[in-house]
Curated annotation (Swiss-Prot):
Record keywords: Amino-acid transport, ATP-binding, Cell inner membrane, Cell membrane, Membrane, Nucleotide-binding, Translocase, Transport
Family of this protein: Belongs to the ABC transporter superfamily. Methionine importer (TC 3.A.1.24) family.
Matches recorded under Pfam families: ABC_tran (PF00005), NIL (PF09383)
EC identifiers of the protein: 7.4.2.11
Cellular component annotations (GO), alphabetically ordered: plasma membrane
Catalytic activity: L-methionine(out) + ATP + H2O = L-methionine(in) + ADP + phosphate + H(+); D-methionine(out) + ATP + H2O = D-methionine(in) + ADP + phosphate + H(+)
Assembly with partners or alone: The complex is composed of two ATP-binding proteins (MetN), two transmembrane proteins (MetI) and a solute-binding protein (MetQ).
Annotated ABC transporter domain residues: 29-270
InterPro entries tied to this protein: AAA+_ATPase (IPR003593), ABC_transporter-like_ATP-bd (IPR003439), ABC_transporter-like_CS (IPR017871), ACT-like_dom_sf (IPR045865), MetN_ABC (IPR041701), MetN_ABC_transporter-like (IPR050086), NIL_domain (IPR018449), P-loop_NTPase (IPR027417)
Organism the protein comes from: Rhodopseudomonas palustris (strain ATCC BAA-98 / CGA009)
Localization (cell): Cell inner membrane
Top enzyme class: translocase
Protein name: Methionine import ATP-binding protein MetN 1
Purpose: Part of the ABC transporter complex MetNIQ involved in methionine import. Responsible for energy coupling to the transport system.
Length: 373
């Protein structure tokens, strides 16, 4: 039996390629106007799990799909790996329309799609080596080839010394490393991750995310992961898609989505990890109208190189106002600096307008949140 080659997508038998094979060589995953409806059952009404979803994941990139529970994330990943079929639309992976394959061809095509699960899904009766070897055994790979394939994978995920350990003897992070190695056993070109870090502690989560980034760099894998944690998106994704109620409400480059979230759902996700939201103590004091002796409260979002500029001191000097910093932080997102400051100032309306105009220079975004006494 022919084995798939690293990063080489499965192809139908030689001859003229059928219509369902995409001619886009740079696209790893293409989701085209997909709709998934679960029909009504007895007293339950029909459920529209996905509604007109379209996404493109370039080969070798990492896309994070984030949404709340019930948003449609798990349904989406089941359609990509062919465990379920859409009611309409197309799913194309590695140039092959998954939704048009027979069961036999689908089983073959799945070898180019690796899957990492939330709860590891390891067989307790098998060692780390045995769990990683399982998909190769199912594919009929010769024993000698299995040995040559599995040992480097265990070494890649940092478990070369744990090959004979059973799942009960491994930590949560080690179990997930075994799961990642198993997902890579058939040398896929696409890796799907279903909440792979949600059952892990923060330190272990960081280690697993770094491992996934290393795998993406070293093997040039296309990675699509679903999560409900924006911190995971910030750490791992090149691009992000926000799903809500079965629809993509926002998508784009990770930095752009963090820097300028357009949808309310996205803004809530972003504020949970960037500190861009006002702290609770300030929200309790904010007033919509200026009280006697009150100060205006501004939120300034700095993007890219502007995050490193001494803008506050310059505005304070030019306009003769004192800007009091109430909260703020600067961090790196997708390799770019991103900062948020919340300040208060006592200024007449005309001076306040000038302050906002100067602070809005370049890529900065300035919002007036209200007033505090």
């Amino acid at each position: 039996m022919n084995e798939p080659i690293m990063n080489a997508p499965w192809q139908p038998p030689a001859g003229e390629l059928p219509a369902f094979v995409s001619s886009q060589p740079t696209i790893g995953i293409l989701i085209d106007r997909v709709r998934k409806v679960y029909p009504a059952r007895k007293s339950s009404a029909e459920v529209v799990a996905l509604d007109d979803i379209s996404l493109t994941v370039p080969k070798g990139s990492i896309l994070g799909v984030i949404g709340r529970s019930g948003a449609g994330k798990s349904t989406l990943i089941r359609l990509i790996n062919g465990l379920d079929k859409p009611s309409s639309g197309r799913v194309i992976v590695n140039g092959v329309e998954i939704t048009a394959l027979s069961e036999r061809d689908l089983r073959t095509a799945r070898r180019s799609i690796g899957m990492v699960f939330q709860h590891f899904n390891l067989l307790s009766s098998r060692t780390a080596f045995g769990n990683v070897a399982l998909p190769l055994e199912i594919a009929g790979t010769p024993k000698a080839e299995i040995e040559k394939r599995v040992l480097p994978l265990l070494d890649m995920v940092g478990l070369a010394d744990k090959r004979d350990r059973y799942p009960a003897e491994l930590s949560g992070g080690q179990k997930q490393r075994v799961g990642i190695a198993r997902a890579l056993a058939t040398e896929p070109s696409v890796l799907l991750s279903d909440e792979a870090t949600s059952a892990l502690d923060p330190e272990t989560t960081d280690q697993i995310l770094e491992l996934l980034k290393q795998i993406n760099r070293d093997l040039h894998l296309t990675i699509l992961f679903i999560t409900h944690e924006m911190a995971v998106v910030k750490a791992l994704a090149d691009r992000v898609a926000v799903i809500e109620g079965g629809r993509i409400v926002e998508d784009g480059a990770t930095f752009d989505v963090f820097a300028t979230p357009r949808h309310e759902v996205t803004r809530r996700f972003v504020s949970s990890v960037t500190g861009s939201g006002a702290p609770d103590w300030l929200l309790e004091k904010l007033q919509p109208q200026q009280p006697p002796g009150g100060q205006a409260v501004l939120r300034i979002t700095f993007k890219g190189s502007d995050a490193n500029q001494p803008l506050l001191s310059r505005v304070s000097r030019d306009l003769g106002v004192n800007l009091n910093i109430l909260s703020g932080q600067v961090e790196m997102i997708a390799g770019h600096p991103f900062g948020t400051l919340i300040v208060s100032l006592d200024a007449a309306p005309e001076v306040l307008r000038q302050v906002i105009a100067q602070l809005s220079a370049g890529n900065n975004l300035v919002e007036q949140l209200g007033y505090v006494a």
